[in-house]
A protein has these predicted regions:
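Helix-loop-helix "hinge/cap" segment bordering the ligand-binding cleft or interdomain interface
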Residues: 92, 156, 452-557, 622-628
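Periplasmic-binding protein-like
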Residues: 496, 634-668
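Extracytoplasmic "Venus flytrap"/periplasmic binding protein-like
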Residues: 375-443, 564-566, 571-574, 590-592
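Extracytoplasmic/periplasmic substrate-binding proteins
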Residues: 546-628, 632
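Short, solvent-exposed loop/beta-turn-alpha elements that line the ligand-binding surface or hinge
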Residues: 429-442, 519-541, 601-611, 734
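Conserved N-terminal structural module of periplasmic/extracytoplasmic solute-binding proteins
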Residues: 25-82, 86-89, 93-95, 132-135, ...
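C-terminal capping/gating helix-and-loop segments adjacent to ligand/active sites or protein-protein/ligand interfaces
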Residues: 612, 672-749
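Hinge/lid segment of periplasmic solute-binding proteins
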Residues: 413-468, 485, 596-603
Length: 757
């Protein structure tokens, strides 16, 4: 069966940006090289994309795509009523469909048939693993079984040529099934389970059964005819080569800092793999791993690549999911010669665990700018299983040494106050008010001001949530905010039947209070500590009334059901929570508490004890030679397309008003035909279903009142937290008084603050 030829989507020559990090270990910190040398070096990682547009094929329905015998083979499926429809298709590299076949399997009741994995034989036939599953259909005595067989199919029409049941090792664990089938193109088929390797010939005769030395997580047929066995072990990803001729496994190879999860046969390299930042080549003989392609350099908004097939040392086909348009693509990628890549002025951006949304906007900026490109350094590659603080340590060392990216992606673990004190960040207010600025009156200026120091804004929050404490208005009153003294009086005044919190340990409360109102005891601007105050001593005394641990194993199902209703029944008064959308208010008031609530916040002598918990914070280096260009990128996060798209609270008033209006409407979704369908919202308290109604204007006003009153920021300083918890432990154990403990914490904290200068 022939179908019309495929069309090719327009490819784009992609330019330069990020310094290679990740995948197979770090290649060095981005801040330690100049922008000029970085621009030249990253030209090595640029690939041109030429998208293949498959007519009449929805890539979301495709299971596998393989390059074999000069053609592209794929299979996929969809469900129609009680039938599973499987298809196989073949295309040539020019985009013409060579064959297409559909098979229908009746799937219903207790039986299901699937055929998701396949390999291409030496003659072009398909060898698939078919799985037939059955279940007892009895909910009280449920059982499940799966039987697998190899099916040889003619590629022209999908017809079955032959089949054979798969011979499993009798000693294999129950549930050990074939999850991969490979072909060496020379008559050998290799079936992979989690414990065994089964070798068949193309006539479906079992030739050899091998027991793996370790659990098998992945396997790849290499170009030399051997099989790379991949296992995830305690020390990392381990590789072994299996010689099919003699059934011998090589010694295990464990590369350092290997981050790839899917591996494919390479050309010029044993294996190719994709990481969050690009594609890498790996040779097992010398344990070498090098970056081949960088996604950002190549103007690709993608977090991973799969179904990769190498066709030469400089070309490969692969499928990827685009973060920019939320759809799947299949493309041919060809390496661009470094001398053919246009040189632009390079802006550097550094952060830890830079997410796909941010990278997508970097790609958009790089495409749209004629003069600038952003180079991304994600320091998270320095983290290991043994040290998850290595990234923060390395980035901090670079910044302190003066190797500062033009754009900094901030996080709560950074010693931001110290950076500001050293003059590392630029004031953003002049940019906001300049020719390429914004109308500040259309934003939550209190959010900006909360991050300002002495009238200067060094960090820009683009969206946020609120960490706060909530109670019934009937218990805590209507006003937001209270002091430590008021909090202590409230806690002491509760009856014996009402706990302050539900199921909260002293460690949880201490951690939350220090993050959300710890600024009460430490002022980085003045380098002053106030841990020896009566407020802090009273807080220690309150913490001592809370349990150190909670044994959740002793909580019965009935107790769990009652815990759902503790706030409704006044068995607990305060909830430490996180609010990120308008609708969170209705679930709290109508659902969890069952009556009007107040965002009372954490105790804070100087203001509202609810804290801004930012989703994304950006800063610009005061040392940057390209601050205007950096601001152009940062400013894009304040524009409508971004502000309207964020899930949690935007800083734009226009975007907030849209979200508020939506919250006052019934919830809805769009069906498969694109029709808007409204539905009734509910909340469960135990097994009781509670109807949740759309928010009223009064509800929306309450949330807006919370947002416009925020003036505290979430603070996380692990070193300071360690000082407090270490010394407080002696007080909780009865070894020191509150006065002694407060004095020791005050002394240690003061020394710590002074050392940060």
């Amino acid at each position: 069966m022939k179908r019309k030829a495929l069309t090719r989507c327009a490819g784009a020559l992609l330019l330069t940006a990020a310094l290679a990090l990740g995948g197979c270990g770090s290649a060095g910190a981005g801040g330690t090289v100049t922008n000029e040398t970085a621009a030249e070096k990253t030209k090595q990682y640029v690939y041109q994309e030429e998208e293949v547009c498959f007519s009449d094929i929805n890539l979301s329905n495709v299971y596998n795509i393989q390059y074999a015998n000069g053609s592209l083979y794929m299979n996929g499926g969809r469900y129609e009523d009680d039938a599973a429809v499987l298809f196989y298709a073949v295309y040539d590299t020019e985009g013409n469909q060579l064959s297409y076949a559909e098979l229908s399997f009746e799937n219903g009741g207790e039986t299901g048939i699937s055929e998701n994995i396949f390999a291409v034989g030496s003659g072009g036939d398909i060898y698939a693993v078919q799985t037939v599953t059955t279940n007892s259909g009895n909910e009280e005595d449920y059982s499940y079984n799966a039987v697998q067989r190899i099916v040889r199919r003619a590629m022209s029409d999908g017809s079955e040529i032959a089949s054979a049941d798969i011979a499993m090792d009798k000693n294999s664990a129950v549930g050990d099934y074939v999850n991969q089938i490979l072909s060496d193109g020379k008559g050998n088929l290799v079936l992979i389970t989690s414990q065994s390797v089964l070798i068949y010939d193309e006539e479906l005769n079992l030739v050899k059964m091998l027991k793996a030395q370790n659990s098998i997580d992945n396997a790849v047929m290499l170009r030399d005819g051997s099989v790379a066995i991949v296992s995830w072990q305690d020390k990392g990803i381990a590789f072994q080569k299996l010689d099919l001729s003699n059934g011998q496994f090589s010694e295990a190879i464990v590369p350092e800092n290997m981050e790839g999860y899917s591996f494919y046969a390479g050309i010029g390299y044993d294996l190719m793999t994709s990481s969050s930042d690009g594609v890498y080549g790996l040779n097992l003989a010398d344990n070498s791993c090098v970056q081949l392609m960088n996604f950002v350099d190549s103007d690709l908004s993608v977090s991973s690549i799969y179904n990769l097939s190498a066709v030469s040392e400089t070309e490969f086909y692969a499928q990827y999911y685009s973060d920019s348009d939320n759809s799947s693509h299949y493309s041919k990628f060809t390496k661009v010669k470094p001398e053919d890549v246009k040189t632009k002025i390079t802006l550097t951006m550094g952060g830890i665990y830079i997410d796909s949304t941010l990278l997508s906007r970097v790609v958009s900026f790089n495409k749209e700018s004629d003069d600038y490109r952003i180079k991304v350094t994600d320091y998270s590659v320095y983290n290991t299983d043994d040290d998850n603080t290595a990234a923060q340590t390395r980035m901090n060392a670079d910044l302190i040494a003066g190797n500062i990216p033009d754009i900094i992606v901030s996080n709560a673990d950074m010693p931001i106050d110290s950076y500001i004190g050293k003059g590392l960040f630029a004031d953003l207010y002049p940019f906001m008010d300049g020719d390429n600025g914004i109308d500040r009156s259309r934003y939550l200026t209190n959010i900006f001001d909360a991050y300002a120091v002495d009238g200067k804004l060094y960090q820009l929050v683009t969206s946020f949530g609120v960490s706060t404490m909530v109670g019934k208005t009937s218990l805590v009153g209507e006003n937001q905010g209270w002091s430590y003294e008021q909090f202590e009086q409230f806690a002491a005044g509760l009856g014996a039947e009402t706990d302050v919190f539900s199921q909260a340990t002293r460690g949880e409360v201490l951690n939350n209070f220090m993050q959300l109102s710890g600024g009460e005891f430490l002022d980085w601007n003045t380098q002053s500590c106030k841990f020896d105050t009566d407020s802090f001593k009273q807080f220690l005394a309150f913490l001592n009334t809370l349990p150190e641990t909670i044994n959740y194993d002793n909580i019965s199902e009935q107790d769990w059901s009652e815990l759902d209703a503790v706030y409704r029944n006044n068995r607990a008064a305060l909830l430490m929570t996180y609010v990120s959308t308008f609708t969170d208010q209705k679930y709290l008031s109508q659902g969890q508490f069952g009556e009007p609530i107040t965002f009372i916040g954490f105790p804070e002598e100087s203001g509202n004890g609810s804290a801004i918990s930012p989703s994304l914070v950006l800063a610009i280096s005061s040392k940057s030679a390209n601050q205007d260009a950096a601001w152009s990128f940062v400013k894009s996060f304040l524009e409508a397309d971004y502000q309207d798209s964020v899930y949690n609270f935007p800083v734009s008033l226009d975007a907030l008003e849209k979200k508020a209006a939506d919250a006052m409407q019934p919830p809805y979704y769009y069906d498969v035909d694109g029709n808007k369908v409204e539905y009734n919202d509910t909340y469960y308290v135990g097994s009781v279903e509670i109807p949740i109604h759309p928010m009223t204007q009064e509800d929306v006003d309450q949330v807006m009142g919370l947002l416009t009153s925020l003036n505290q920021t979430l603070r996380i300083d692990s070193s300071l937290m360690n000082i407090v918890t270490e010394e407080a432990a002696a007080y909780f154990a009865g070894q020191k008084t509150a006065d002694e403990t407060a004095q020791i914490i005050q002394s240690r904290a003061k020394i710590y603050v002074e050392e940060q200068e």
